[in-house]
UniProtKB/Swiss-Prot annotation:
Name under which the protein is recorded: Glutamyl-tRNA(Gln) amidotransferase subunit C, mitochondrial
Species the sequence originates in: Drosophila persimilis
Chief location bin: mitochondrion
One GO molecular-function entry: glutaminyl-tRNA synthase (glutamine-hydrolyzing) activity
Record keywords: ATP-binding, Ligase, Mitochondrion, Nucleotide-binding, Protein biosynthesis
Listed Pfam families: GatC (PF02686)
GO cellular component annotations of the record: glutamyl-tRNA(Gln) amidotransferase complex; mitochondrion
Membrane-crossing segments per the record: none
Protein task: Allows the formation of correctly charged Gln-tRNA(Gln) through the transamidation of misacylated Glu-tRNA(Gln) in the mitochondria. The reaction takes place in the presence of glutamine and ATP through an activated gamma-phospho-Glu-tRNA(Gln).
Catalyzed reactions per annotation: L-glutamyl-tRNA(Gln) + L-glutamine + ATP + H2O = L-glutaminyl-tRNA(Gln) + L-glutamate + ADP + phosphate + H(+)
Length: 173
C-alpha cells in the first residue's frame, strides 16, 4: 500500500494518509497503514467510495439508461378549487401560492408518467439485495384471534381501533 491506504471500503489519497499517520515519507506511511486497525480514514473531501471494483455480479446497469417517458398531455389532470381545499385540509399544507400549485401540478404529471410506464416482462423485486436470497415463508395463521391481546398494547383504544395522537394541528378554515 504505497500510494493509497484502504480502510474498509474507503480509499484515501496519500496526503490524507500522511495527515492521519503523521509519517513524512511514503515508506513509513505504508508501514504505518498496513494494519486496518491502526488506520482510521477521516471523512473529508478527499475520501471517496471506490465503486469501480464490484464484489458481485449485478443486474443494475453501470451506466445511465435513457428512459423515454410517455407524453401524457392528453391526460392532463385539472384540479378544481374544491379539490385543493380538500388536499389542504387533509395534508395540513397551505397551497395558496402559485409556486405551491405549480409544484402540485408537476408532481401529479410526474406520477401520471410513472403510472403509464410499460412494466411488462419485469419481474417483481422482493429485496434490494441482489446477492442474497430472500426466504419467503408460507402465509399460514399460527396464532389466530388474538385481537384482545393486541389491543391491550395500546394506551388508548376506541371500540376495536387504536387511537393515535394527532400529528399536527389542523388549519383553521
Amino acid at each position: 500500500m504505497n500510494k493509497n491506504c484502504i480502510s474498509a471500503s474507503w480509499r484515501c489519497d496519500e496526503r490524507t494518509a500522511r495527515q492521519v499517520c503523521s509519517a513524512d515519507d511514503s515508506d513509513k506511511m505504508a508501514d504505518c497503514c498496513k494494519r486496518p486497525e491502526d488506520f482510521q480514514c477521516p471523512i473529508n473531501k478527499t475520501a471517496k467510495l471506490d465503486f469501480k471494483e464490484l464484489r458481485y455480479a449485478t443486474k443494475v446497469p453501470q451506466t445511465p439508461v435513457d428512459t423515454v417517458f410517455p407524453e401524457t398531455t392528453a391526460n392532463r389532470v385539472e384540479i378544481d378549487a374544491k379539490t385543493i381545499q380538500l388536499l389542504e385540509r387533509l395534508s395540513l399544507v397551505n397551497l395558496d401560492s402559485e409556486q405551491a400549485l405549480a409544484t402540485l401540478n408537476s408532481s401529479i404529471q410526474f406520477a401520471d408518467k410513472i403510472a403509464h410506464i410499460n412494466t411488462e416482462n419485469v419481474r417483481p423485486l422482493y429485496t434490494v439485495l441482489e446477492n442474497q436470497q430472500l426466504q419467503l415463508r408460507n402465509d399460514e395463521v399460527k396464532e389466530g384471534d388474538c385481537r384482545v391481546e393486541l389491543l391491550r398494547n395500546a394506551k388508548v383504544t376506541d371500540e376495536d381501533y387504536y387511537v393515535s395522537p394527532p400529528g399536527n394541528i389542523p388549519l383553521e378554515q
